[in-house]
Amino acid sequence: MMKTNIGRRNFLKQSGATLFYGALITRAQTPPSERIRVAHVGTGGMGGAHINAFSAMPDVETVALCDVDSTRLAASAQRLVQRKPSAKPQTYADYRRILERKDIDVVTCATPDHWHALVAIHAFEAGKDVYGEKPLSYSLREGQRMEQTQRRTGAVFQLGTQIHAGDNYHRVAEIIQSGVLGKIGTVRLWKTGGSRGFGFPANQRPPDTLDWNMWLGPAPYAEYTPVRCHGTFRYFFDYSGGVFADFWCHIADILFMSLQPEGLTTIDARGEVPGDGIADTPKWIDADFAFKGLNVHWTTKPPPVPGADKMSIGAHFEGEKGTLTCDYETRKIRIGKEVLDDLPNVPVTLPRSPGHHRNFLDAVKSRGVPESNLPYVRKMTLPMHLALASFRLKRKITWDSVKEEVVGDPAA
C-alpha cells in the first residue's frame, strides 16, 4: 500500500496563503427567501444526525454527501432519499470536489477529529459557511488558524454542541450570573470513564470500500486495524484526545457560557494510559486550571460533590453563598442538596435558541453570529489542548493568555 502523509505542519504553513481554494472566495449570496444548499462531509454517527436535522428544515436542500467509506456513504444517501424522496444528493469520496462547486452554501463536517480544522479552513477559503463538530480542532494552533481564516473570509461557523441551545443551559447561566450564589471561586467538571486499551489486534488490509490513506490524511501513517477507525478512532492521540477531548466542550460550555473565564495562567494534568492495548489516550485524567479569580477542576472520576456519584457527567459551581450542581444527563439542577427544575425568582435574561441547527441557518441568512461561534468555542477548547499537553509532558504548564503562548517550555 502506498503510504501518504499530507503533513499537518506544512498545511498550517500554507493555509495563511491560498491553500486549494484561496482564489475561489466567491460566497453564494443566498437571499433569505431561498433555500440553503448544504453538503455533508462525514456521514457516520454525528454526520447522520446532521443530515437528518438539516434535511428536515424547509429552507434547506441537501445537495451532496461525502465519505471515504463508500458503504456508509451509500447507506446515508439511501436513508436520506427514503425520508425525503425529493432529495437528489450527489455523493463524493473527496471533500475537495464538493468545495469546487459554486452552488453549495454550507458544509457540515463530522469527520474524525484530525480532519476538523482542515476541512473547515478549506471550506472557508472556498466561500462556504461551516457547521463543525467537536472538538473544534486537533491542536491549539489549528484553532488559531481557523479563527484567522474565518475572520479574513467572513464565513459563518457554528460548533455542533447542540446542548448549548437548550433552555436548561441558558437557565444555569442566568442563575449564576444573577449573583444568587455569590462570587464563584471553584468549578468542578467531570465525565466518568476513560479510554480502553483494545488489546493488540493484528494489522489488516483495509476494506476495499474504505480509502484508508484519505482517512488518515494529515495523521502519521499507520497500518489499518478496525479499532483505529470509525467509532474508536478517538482513543488514539494521532487522531484525537480520548474521552477528555470528546466531552470537554460539552461540560466546559456551561462554565464558559456562565462565567466567561479569563486570564488562564497554569494547567496541571495527571493521568494514566490503559497499558493493555494499542490505544494511548488516558483511561483517567485529572486536570487543574487556574484562571483569574477562578479555579477549575476536571476529573474522569466522581468528584467530591454530594450526589455526584450518581451523575456520570456534570458540573458543580461553588459560590460564596451557595452551590449549584448540573446533571448533564437528566438536565436537572441542584442547589445545595435540593434538586430543582428552576429558581423562579431569578429573572430570564438570555434570549432562547430556536435550536442549534436553526440558529446556525439563521446566521447564514443574516450573516450574523451564531451562539457557538468560532471565537467563543476556540477560547473554550484551548484549555483542553493545554491539559492534554500537560498530561503527555507529565508536568505543569504556564500559559501567557495575552500572547497565547506557553511560557518557558518549548516542548509544549
List where the protein language model places each region:
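Structural recognition of the beta-strand scaffold that forms the well-ordered cores
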Residues: R37-H40, T62-C66, T108-C109, Y131-G132, ...
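Glycine-/small-residue-rich active-site loops that bind phosphorylated ligands and cofactors
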Residues: M46, W115, S137-Y138, H164-A165, ...
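A contiguous active-site-proximal alpha/beta segment in oxidoreductase catalytic domains
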Residues: D129-Y131, S137-M214
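Contiguous beta-strand/loop segments that form the cofactor/metal-binding neighborhood of enzyme cores
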Residues: R171, K183, R188, S195-R334, ...
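Hydrophobic residues in alpha-helical segments
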Residues: S55, L99, Q150, I176, ...
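N-terminal glycine-/serine-/threonine-rich beta1-alpha1-beta2 phosphate-ribose binding loop
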Residues: M2-G132, R141-V156
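Alpha-helix termination/capping residues and helix-transition junctions
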Residues: M57-D59, R101, S178-L181, T209, ...
